Every structure is written in C-alpha cells, then in structure tokens.
Design a protein with these regions (language model features):
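Nucleic-acid endo/exonuclease domains
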Residues: 48-81, 85-86, 147-148
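Nucleic-acid nuclease catalytic cores
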Residues: 74-95, 99-174
Length: 174
C-alpha cells in the first residue's frame, strides 16, 4: 500500500469528479483528464508533475499552524497523515484536523468532526469564503466546490459525523 498522494483521487481534487459534460451524460473533459492522469501515475508509480511550492500555498501552510494554535485543545492536527478509503485504494485524503469521541459506556470510539483550515492569501477570497459559509452550506458548495467536496471526501474517509470548514485570516497585529 502506498503512503503518498500520487496515483490516487485526493480529497483536495475530488471536486473535479463531480463535473459532468454539457449533456450531463458523462464526466466533463476536465474530469476525464484527471482520471487519465491518476491512471498514468499508477502506471508510473510516481507523480506526473513535480509539486510546486507557491506563495499562496506557503502562506496557507504557515498560517494553518497559527489557526490550529488558537483552537480548543480537542482539535488534533493530522494534516501529515494520508488516509485511504478501505475499499477504494485509489481514493485518499489528508484532513487538517479531527476531533475524536469516546463513548465509555458503549465502548466505542471514532471521529466526531473532520475539519479543513482555509487560510486564503487574498483578503477578498477570505471574505468571500466567510460570506458564503455564513449564508448557507449550499452557498459555500456553489461558490467553493473544491473546499466543499474536500470536506465531504475527508468526512467519508474518516467516518466523521460532521465536517467543518475553518476560515482564518490573521489580523495585521499578528
């Protein structure tokens, strides 16, 4: 079993598979290309393209830690752990945070909440995400389908009861 992202449909890109062609009879061209790329990665045993570090990605990674440090102690940072679907080996994800539950009476435990922290580089995007999320889940799904489907995918992979988007933008003073 592999421990890396290549050769899998990842939670962060799973939204591509929700797109249909104009006739709504098949996957969109973009989805078909994604499926082909994952197939190539499986054949090659490596990623097709080298992952590039961009300024917005570096910002998000840096600020995500700050956001985590502001959250209650129940949250566990798990973003370095890649999870795989138990039946679909080509489906994986790496959620940012989880909150576990333990029911001592019934002797069961699991994941209550799975969370993804979004720290947009742009304040405009930050405000757009907050506005959409405050409006409704459907508005967030419509405006930010990649974020929405990433949460859904990670909820399935973890078995979490709830999925939570945490949108964070530091103050200038921070």
């Amino acid at each position: 079993m592999q421990n890396n992202r290549h050769g899998t449909f990842s939670s962060s890109s799973i939204h591509i598979l929700t797109q249909l062609n104009k006739a709504k009879t098949d996957f969109s061209e973009k989805a078909q290309k994604y499926i082909k790329q994952v197939g190539y990665e499986l054949e090659l045993g490596r990623p097709l393209n080298a992952e590039r570090d961009s300024r917005p990605t570096s910002w998000g990674t840096f600020v995500e830690t700050r956001a985590f440090n502001l959250l209650p102690i129940e949250y566990q940072l798990v973003s370095q752990t890649r999870l795989f679907h138990p039946e679909i080996s080509t489906w994986s994800g790496a959620p940012d945070l989880i909150i576990e539950f333990i029911d001592f009476i019934n002797e069961i435990e699991g994941i209550e909440v799975v969370s993804d922290v979004k720290c947009p580089f742009s304040l405009e995007v930050f405000l757009d995400k907050v506005k959409a999320l405050n409006e409704s889940v459907e508005a967030y799904k419509k405006e930010f389908p990649a974020d929405y489907w990433q949460l859904v995918s990670n909820a399935v992979l973890t078995g979490a009861k709830y999925a939570e988007a945490i949108i964070y933008g530091p103050y200038v003073s921070e």
